Amino acid sequence: MMSVVLIGDSIRLGYQPQVQRLLAGEAEVWGPETNGGHAVNVLMHLHLWAKHRQPDLIHINCGLHDLRTDHFGGGEPLVPLPVYALYVERILRYLRTHTRAAVVWATTTPVIDAAAKAEHARWSDFDRSDADVRAYNGFATAICARLGVPVNDLEAVVRARGPETMQNGDGVHYTEAGSAILAEAVAAAIRAHRPR
């Protein structure tokens, strides 16, 4: 049976159980119990999450934690775009050289600006912007194209349906039904790119 590793943030944690159900009998699907966080954290954990597991396929994303602008950080993204691009390339090259897995990159899902801003205003912690989602995805997909890494465009899946119809009201996270739609797209990408 094919072994699959899912790496990503809380969006991945939301769709992972449904991907496991969709691929039951086809693939053993595993993902870290923890949120993958930003690209630097993902790279720091790839030896545990990917190298030592040696799966057949890795479906991976990071971005929402990279592009967040912390209120205590002067309004700059936690991981600025040029640094994010550097780390995305390092992540993909690491997976290529340290695993035998097929790799699928997933784009970062959209942010509803007003809802996200209202949610985080309660905590005075950080903001996210949909314009940054588009910019960060643009850099990541260009790197994937250059390296020959297929992309599962979850951003496009959500935009086609309408983020407001899938999200739970906080501008970022998904309802169970929304996560089910993402899970279907992830399962389809895994089936399409499974090693032959």
Describe each model-derived feature in a short phrase.
Residues 7-9, 34-38, 81, 128-129:
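Short, flexible loop segments at the rims of nucleotide/cofactor-binding pockets, characterized by
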Residues 15-27:
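A short, Lys/Arg-enriched amphipathic alpha-helix followed by its capping loop at the start of a domain
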Residues 22-25, 43-196:
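Alpha-helical cap/lid subdomain in secreted, periplasmic
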Residues 5-8, 31-32, 173:
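Short catalytic-loop micro-motif centered on adjacent basic/acidic residues
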Residues 26-42:
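A short beta-strand-loop structural module common to alpha/beta enzyme folds
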Residues 1-17, 38, 67:
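Catalytic nucleophile-elbow at a beta strand-turn-alpha helix junction centered on a G-D-S/GDSL motif
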